[in-house]
């Protein structure tokens, strides 16, 4: 028997949904931002639609100038969209000033007050809101414990490391209990090891507080490490939206394949072998096999394969896998892995990441002729 769900009317200015849980923390509807200088108009963000869920760690990822920071600034209220609607928890906040939006921002510059202690820095926003002193002490203590700085409450910022200062800035933003926290490349000033440690720390904190984090970065490893979902941006548009695994394993465009991780791009004219399999022949006994949907054209395919999916060896692989012969042009030993660059007969360079096992017989040297092979499901077909 069919059932129906009773819907409660939404409050004025709030989008009606099946339940409060279904209301996105942040939504952008056909949002664009253009800048005009004289007769020149520059489009920073072009008609993007985006929903960020309650309680998720969401990253806006892309190269410099892709529009990710402008998008975040429109969410925060520091920039007003040229067109479109910005909603927070279903409420239209387009045109609402930043101080009236229930979001806080953390920047790469920590902006801590040097003359104040750690506790005073964290308490600053609460004091401006005239929160009772007893509540301030409780909330500040809770936040400092959360960021593991409870024993540093009386320290001045200059007495802290860069990572500790970043955690103070994070506590200062979270103590206000915003519905969402916006982070604009906050780890950019830290060294590599500290940055990697802080990535895990940020994810832990986000899980514990349970609020929405929106993270802007150009660093793919940061986005892949921390995010529940990622929007990859390019030239003011969202090229792909998905989980880290979806973005990495099944890139939607050639740009995403090249920007996220390392990809080998192969092109050619394909012939359909079966309903779900195509083959590109490279002469002789060399070919690439790829799984494809039935409706995809057989001509002019672009195929990507990740370096770690490829096996390198001296023996001819089986015919039921992709197999290409080439000459080793470069060998880079990196401890756990060795990276090979192999030049094929059509002068295409293919990069291979091979795990270094105790069996050294699989290793190849510069100038060696080798076979590369991978399974059909590891060849991902992109739009031509």
From Swiss-Prot:
Membrane topology listed for this record: Peripheral membrane protein
Pfam families per the UniProt record, alphabetical: ABC_tran, TOBE_2
Catalysed reaction equations from the record: ATP + H2O + polyamine-[polyamine-binding protein]Side 1 = ADP + phosphate + polyamineSide 2 + [polyamine-binding protein]Side 1
Binding partners and assembly: The complex is composed of two ATP-binding proteins (PotA), two transmembrane proteins (PotB and PotC) and a solute-binding protein (PotD).
Keywords: ATP-binding, Cell membrane, Membrane, Nucleotide-binding, Translocase, Transport
Lineage start: Bacteria, Bacillati, Actinomycetota, Actinomycetes, Streptosporangiales
Functional description taken from the UniProt entry: Part of the ABC transporter complex PotABCD involved in spermidine/putrescine import. Responsible for energy coupling to the transport system.
NCBIfam families with a match to the protein in the record: potA (TIGR01187)
Gene designation: potA
Family membership: Belongs to the ABC transporter superfamily. Spermidine/putrescine importer (TC 3.A.1.11.1) family.
Record-level Gene Ontology MF annotations: ABC-type putrescine transporter activity; ATP binding; ATP hydrolysis activity
EC number: 7.6.2.11
Binding-site residues for ATP, renumbered to this chain: 62-69
Record's protein name: Spermidine/putrescine import ATP-binding protein PotA
UniProt cross-references to PANTHER family, sorted A to Z: SPERMIDINE/PUTRESCINE IMPORT ATP-BINDING PROTEIN POTA (PTHR42781), SPERMIDINE_PUTRESCINE IMPORT ATP-BINDING PROTEIN POTA (PTHR42781:SF4)
Keyword Hydrolase: no
Domain ABC transporter: start-end pairs: 26-260
Keyword Hydrolase: no
Organism: Thermobifida fusca (strain YX)
């Amino acid at each position: 028997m069919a059932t129906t769900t009773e819907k409660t009317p939404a409050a004025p200015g709030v989008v009606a949904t099946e339940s409060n849980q279904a209301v996105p923390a942040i939504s952008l509807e056909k949002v664009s931002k253009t800048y005009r200088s004289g007769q020149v108009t520059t489009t920073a963000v072009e008609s993007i639609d985006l929903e960020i869920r309650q309680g998720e760690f969401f990253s806006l990822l892309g190269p410099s100038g892709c529009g990710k920071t402008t998008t975040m600034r429109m969410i925060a209220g520091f920039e007003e969209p040229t067109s479109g609607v910005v909603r927070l928890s279903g409420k239209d906040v387009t045109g609402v000033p930043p101080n009236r939006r229930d979001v806080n921002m953390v920047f790469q510059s920590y902006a801590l007050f040097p003359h104040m202690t750690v506790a005073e820095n964290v308490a600053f926003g609460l004091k401006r809101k005239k929160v009772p002193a007893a509540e301030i002490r409780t909330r500040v203590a809770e936040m400092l414990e959360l960021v593991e700085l409870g024993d540093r409450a009386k320290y001045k910022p200059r007495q802290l490391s860069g990572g500790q200062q970043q955690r103070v800035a994070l506590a200062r933003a979270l103590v206000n209990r915003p519905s969402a926290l916006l982070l604009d490349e906050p780890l950019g000033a830290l060294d590599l090891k500290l940055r990697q440690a802080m990535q895990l720390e940020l994810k832990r904190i986000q899980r514990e507080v349970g609020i929405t984090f929106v993270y802007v970065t150009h660093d793919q490893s940061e986005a892949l490490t921390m995010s529940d979902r990622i929007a990859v941006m390019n030239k003011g548009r969202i090229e792909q939206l998905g989980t880290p695994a979806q973005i990495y394993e099944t890139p939607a465009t050639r740009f995403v394949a090249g920007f996220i991780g390392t990809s080998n791009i192969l092109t050619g004219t394909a012939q359909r072998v079966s309903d779900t399999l195509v083959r590109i022949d490279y002469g002789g006994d060399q070919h690439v096999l790829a799984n494809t949907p039935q409706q995809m054209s057989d001509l002019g395919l672009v195929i990507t394969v990740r370096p770690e999916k490829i096996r390198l060896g001296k023996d001819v692989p089986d015919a039921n896998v992709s197999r290409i012969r080439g000459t080793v042009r470069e060998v880079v030993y990196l401890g756990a892995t060795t990276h090979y660059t192999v030049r094929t007969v059509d002068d295409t360079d293919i990069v291979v990441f091979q795990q270094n096992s105790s069996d050294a017989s699989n290793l190849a040297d510069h100038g060696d002729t080798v076979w590369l092979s991978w399974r059909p499901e590891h060849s991902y077909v992109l739009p031509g």
